[in-house]
Every structure is written in structure tokens, then in C-alpha cells.
């Protein structure tokens, strides 16, 4: 009997878990795929574990909860108690048939799903200490040292860790002492294929050949995604381009500014309409583990203006597919926006360059090929040394 592949996930992970599941089905088609959802199949089936963990949240994070620097929900998966319970429960659940599995793979790094005796891999978009790379990060929001030690075990219990970006790879090495050859950046792709009925197909642009001077901001977290800074930059843009428009999709900030259009939340099916209407895409985010929304902007051949932090330098090629700047420097941001609004040809060139980046690197087929080849190589090494 052929061995199975074990896939451990939690929820949808913004549809990333669907995309990764498809990768495993495609790349390891000769093996049955078994899926365990940590929330639905493990924690929800153990009420005692759930309630004990709420007590653990209070024990570890009471000062932060009282000061409101952290929310109970954010802390729930960051207690040593839940970390150990997940790890131990999975080990007990599968101990008797661990020989049935070729390997296991988990997405995200909020729990240790490794099982002794099964080669284990991790695919993640962040580490907690990646936040140290962001100048605006509030260190009072750091989770407990005890939990960070549990997080360290996640990476060290894996045969290999795969990251969506190079700065997260560097964090694994610098902050968690993961050997360089045990962590690899494989990037990520757009999840619109599974999140929408239109299968992620880009809508033809409706921006009058990049001449309509519309800037799109698409994001749910207005503050974290740099919305206030964009408004400040946009006011400066209006001094040179009084007909420019800024469309805000995904959130509803209260802002008094000319030509500032709040669209708010829209169904996922309609998000591509707002990419299609834009000439420029701008989200000057202050924190960005990866940023799939920028991949989707490139899928629509839009030039991007964003921040020079996190994963953005690996997504946006400075001066070729977009412009990057310090997210707090609104004067430079305004200049970059004006440069694009004044040159439809530059917009077209940047958009085409970004589109090629998606076709060649930032797509799930490329991610799947790279990850699967690496997993096979690691397994060959493990099994050959065992024999």
C-alpha cells in the first residue's frame, strides 16, 4: 500500500490552504492526501482543551489584555498550553499508524503539528519575530517568551521550513537559529482562483489606457496598511493633479478629502472590478508578511506604489514594476504617484513587468514545483540514509 501525505492546516488562511492542498494533490498524485484541520478536527472536538486554553490566555497575557495592546483572539494560539496540547494530541492520534505516511506538511507557524516518526515540513508567511524588521511595530504587542520558545520548536522539529518571502527566511535564521540549508523561500501566488466564481481571471482594464488618474487602495486594515499616510500623500498629488481620484475598497475610513471615494467592503467577486478601474495601485503598508493583494494587482497589469519593507522588495522590482518608499515619507510617495499619473506609458511598462513576474515566479504552479522538488530531495536523503 502506498504511503499517504498528511496535510495539517487551520481554516482557510485567506484561501492559501486551498491552494496548498491543490499543490499536494497535483504534485503527489500517486499518494492519497489526508487532511486534518487543527481547529475543526482537533480543538473543537476537545471542549476541555478549549476552556483550559482561555485560562492560559489570561495567565500569560493579562496585562496586555487589560491595556488592550492585545486581544484575546490574537493570543489564543500563542500560549505554551495550546502549543503543547496540539503537538501531544496529534502525536497520540497518529502514533499507531505513523508508518502509513510519506510526510506531513503544515501551513502557518502558530502550532507545532510535527509527529515523531513522520518527516515534517512547514510552509509559513511569517515568524513572530519578523515584526522586529518593521520600524513601526509596537513591542508591547510581543507575545510571551514562553510561547516564542514553543514557536522555535516548530521550525526545529521540521525537516525543512518553506517561507513566502526572503525576510521571513532571514528571521528563521537570525531569530530562531534555523540552519540556512533548512529554510527556503518559495514565494506564493494569488488565491483568487479558488476564492471567486470567475476563477481569478483578471478583468480587462477600464482605465482609458492608464489615463484616468484613478488610484486604488484595496485592504481591510486601514491603519496597518498605511491608509492615513496615503491620504496625506494624495492631498499633495491633488495639488498637481486636481482630477485624480482615490478609491478605497475593503474598509470605510472617515476621511474629509476631495476626490476620496469610500467603496467599503465588497464581495470578492467584485474586487477585480476595482483593479480594472485603476491606473495605479497603492497600499503603503507598515507590516507585510507577503502581500497577495500586490500579486493580484500585477495580475491586472497595474503599476504598484508601496513600502520598502517586509516582502515587498521581493514582489515589486523598484523602478521596473513599481516604486517603493518609506511608508512614512508621504512626499516621496506623492512624487512616485505623480510620476505614474503623468506617464501612461510608464504605467503600462511597469504593469507588464509585474505581470511577467507573476507568470514566472509568483504563482502556485511555480511554488508547487519548487516545494515538491525540495520535499522529494529531502525525503530521498532521509530514506537513503535510513537504509
Predicted regions and their residues:
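Membrane-proximal helix-turn-helix segments that form the acceptor-binding/catalytic region
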Residues: 141-161
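Short hydrophobic beta-strand element within catalytic cores of glycosyltransferases
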Residues: 303-306, 316
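A short, well-ordered alpha-helix in the C-terminal region of glycosyltransferases
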Residues: 332, 339, 346-361, 367-373
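Conserved acidic donor-binding segment of nucleotide-sugar-dependent glycosyltransferases
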Residues: 318-319, 323-330, 339-345
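Short alpha-helical donor nucleotide-sugar binding micro-motif in glycosyltransferases
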Residues: 266, 273-278
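Conserved donor-binding/catalytic core segment of Leloir-type glycosyltransferases
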Residues: 193, 199-225, 231-235
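Aromatic "clamp/platform" in nucleotide-sugar-dependent glycosyltransferases that forms part
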Residues: 286
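Carbohydrate-associated surface elements
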Residues: 167, 189
